[in-house]
Amino acid sequence: MMQKYQDSSLSPEERASDLLARMNLDEKFGQIQCYNAIDSFLGKSVEKQNPYGVGQVCILIATMLDDVGSAAGLITRLQKQIMESGKHHIPAIFHIETLTGVMVTAATSFPCGLGQASTWDPEQQQKMAACITRQGRAMGISHALAPVFDICRDPRFGRMGETYGEDPTLAAAMGTAYVKGLQDKHRMSACSKHFLGFMAGQGGIHTAQAVVSPRELREVYAKPFQAAITDGKLDSVMNSYAAIDGQVPAGSKAILRDLLRSEMGFNGVTVSDYSAVEQLESIYHLAESPADAGRLALEAGMDQELPTIAAYNDELKENIRSGVVQESLLDEAVLRILTMKFRLGLFENPFPAENVQAEITPADTALNRKIAQESMILLKNDGVLPLAKSVKKVAVIGWHADSVRALFGGYSALAMKENTLGVKMSMAGIQADADSPAAENAVQKTYPGSEVVMENPGVEPLARRCYPDAYSMLGALRLAAPHTEFLYAQGYPYAGNEESGHDAALQIAKDADLVICTLGGHYGWNASCTTGEGIDAMHIGLPVCQERFLEKLESLHKPVVGVHFDGHPISSDTADRVCNAILEAWAPGAQGGEAIAALLTGTANPCGKLPCTVARHEGQIPVYYNHPTNTCYSMTGGTPKNAYIDGAHTPRYCFGHGLSYTKYEYDTLRLEKDAIQADGVLKGQLHVRNAGNKAGTEIVQFYVHDVAASMVRPVKELVGFAKVNLQPGEEKTVCLSLPMSQLAFLDADMRWKVEHGKVELMVGASSEDIRGKAEFMIVGDAYPDGKNRSFVADTKIM
């Protein structure tokens, strides 16, 4: 006889409730645990570790396997063992990182998070996520640990490159699109992270305490999560490591129950960041034992502990059995987990596709190349780009120029795979084995003048073997411009003060019509990297070896193009002075080399815009465009001049900045009405025209400023944007619909309030390049439900 939970015609909630009622304590407890698939290679079988079944499986080991078929085979074997371990045959959820694509080398590898944000293209983001879902689910992966919703205003923080930048509206738009694309038709579940305020850590230090007020926590840091919960029906959330106001999210009722569930209306599954529950005892000393840490987390509303059994252990289970810990806490967690499994269709389709092969279609590659091209930002250009036909000989200099590895950042499959070559890994929650063969053979030599371990010589051959169709920037340039001679010298590394290669590089520069210098660090996951998880820095500029080379190059009076690779934006007085043009390339992924070549040669027109403000110096940090009135670089009093005694308050490059090979003209911003009820919608429009002779794409940005308010408000805030494709001479109309609920802020009583008064609407090509303004009046006050307010204004192009 079919049981209710076996009836696929019933809702996931009904099926989960029925199954939960049939499970004993041991079976239920297994659902809040995770098995790390790497243990299957270490003699620790899933049957032995999780004899009553398991809720999740960490499948990061798939990155180390040779092909998709091997990964799918491992998932099939483990899933069969798990389902056979219990009378209800409950399948496990298999999770993997998907920030830049499914984290296996046979899947599509997209640009890093900052690069994705720089496209300002939610529609494209949704397509990217759909590609990730198709490739991941075919392998048997059902839980994607992405997107990253952290708001980052500090380039010292090594994980900035994972984020959508500094603005909550842009992050909400991009991340919600990712969630919708990934969760379409319930094929995979997205896991947004890290809740909450993670990258506001003091000193730009990974996992350090975040000093954020309750108001800012909700208005800024929670906004992308809220948008994904409300508009994207987000399935799961991962906690932050960072303590906030004395509380650690993994064990905080105030954060997980009161804020996330009660205030924000989240009813999905919460999962711990790796080892975060155990750290309540081992690092934060909030518990007396791992099991006590597990109790704190379960009481706080943490549903599953990843990536392996630590605090959700047998002692905690026996404490539940004896009544020391309430079984109802376990039941509510398991109910949510089972509901997600039924929603994903795992009971009907628990295994990978049969005979699965790598399926990177031509459409996937084209999408990846388009995202890579549009992720890059032309920060500066005096006319030297695109490369003129008169340029016959180009000197290309820098480690990144002829490196395929340089195209990939942290949370890419390649960054994970290179850890097999023996350099100490930096991923949080994963302990390096000091006695492993890899550690034994680790390269310990560092770049002179730094603590960065020299790159293993096997990394580049590994990169080219894993991505045989990927071109380095140099290789792509030679293909894109076959009649131009490209001379190459490494010149300098990506860290330290080594100058021994300068002379050879300067020699080829003397003979060239133009010089391309690749600049920046090494973005990844181990001790040979300069930025990444657990790899933070005091200095935000270029390494000394690159700065000194640029100073020497300046004396040759050659046109210089700088191409910057990294997980944070370029910040260099020397580069600004010496380079005639600067292209920010971030970590552009497998198609990055060809994307750069297309932009430099002019077959593509740059259209990326900065998702972050670029500081001149680390002493300015934090510097961000939507700062409160009379703060940061908008000070209006209290100092003799609007500057430090040794430098400007203003940033190097502003949020939203990005140049093109054409020019765009904006006409007058017109409003349908200049008085809007507090629960109404403002409508406006303007015309944008391509006034140049090259087709291009402009990102039209809308900002608001509260003229007078009851609380100190930001000097301006992004409310919406439109990406407009224009042929030479073409004009299009951009229409804006802005619900007043999007302008709600927390009043003195911490209620969401749309407040009566004047508001200035601005439109521009960046946060500082404002092309038009219009003022309107909000009539009356309104108190919207914070979780159902508007998050991103709607725009249409006609």
Regions found by a protein language model. Name each.
Residues 1-744, 756-763, 767-768, 784, ...:
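Glycoside hydrolase catalytic-domain context in secreted enzymes
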Residues 747-749:
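Flexible, membrane-facing loop/turn or short amphipathic-helix motifs
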Residues 752-753:
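Surface-exposed, short loops/turns at beta-strand junctions within beta-sandwich domains
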Residues 769-785:
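Short beta-strand elements
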